Amino acid sequence: MHMSFVPDTQNKEFQDALNLIQYTRQSVFLTGKAGTGKSTFLRYICEHTKKKHVVLAPTGIAAINAGGSTLHSFFKLPFYPLLPDDPNFSLQRGRIHEFFKYTKPHRKLLEELELVIIDEISMVRADIIDAVDRILRVYSRNLREPFGGKQILLVGDVFQLEPVVKGDERDILNRFYPTPYFFSARVFGQIDLVSIELQTVYRQTDKVFVNVLDHIRSNTVGAADLQLLNTRYGTQIEQSEACLLYTSDAADE
């Protein structure tokens, strides 16, 4: 069933981010703790924007949840570290054209895109962001502006999932980036990225419990938090038999 997402008109941060995306070319980093409406914002933008856009995410599950594609599949990225000194990613002499060999429709899509949305940005490595920047510059025929002049919307929470970096990859990336996180990408030294943090938690209504979750999130748990959590230890929950099913159709039956 198709659901229309209605924004909270009293939520100033939501409205500020919405106005920037809808009525300007300003790139935005939208963040906030769990349950503050990041996914709702993303869906609302996708449903209402008139801009030609694409929704991307670092993993298949995240891409499905966001209603988009993975970064690697959309840009045809290799899975090894995409280093700034790799000649295949050079802006000179058509090297990117030679390496990626996109189809004509895909090249046209990259050129005409106005808004690039990346969900779960906390899981995206810095080198991937820099590679996307170079690709968009080349296929937008705009080498001077970051991301080829495209508007970028990054959505996520750096307190949640981090980039997956294997041991040998970390050693390689450390030569070029202070951290593997997206915000260490070199392109962000050239772009005015506005950060907006959603504040209102919609998922939980118990303010005391929300405060405990905040303390866990920021690694500032105190004795009072532990005492409160321990009051729930040993609580009896009604048991029922679990039935493992392999398809949603079977579950519906």
What are these regions (language model features)?
Residues 1-249:
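Conserved ATP-binding/catalytic motifs of P-loop helicase motor domains
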Residues 253:
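Extended, polar beta-sheet/loop recognition surfaces of beta-rich domains
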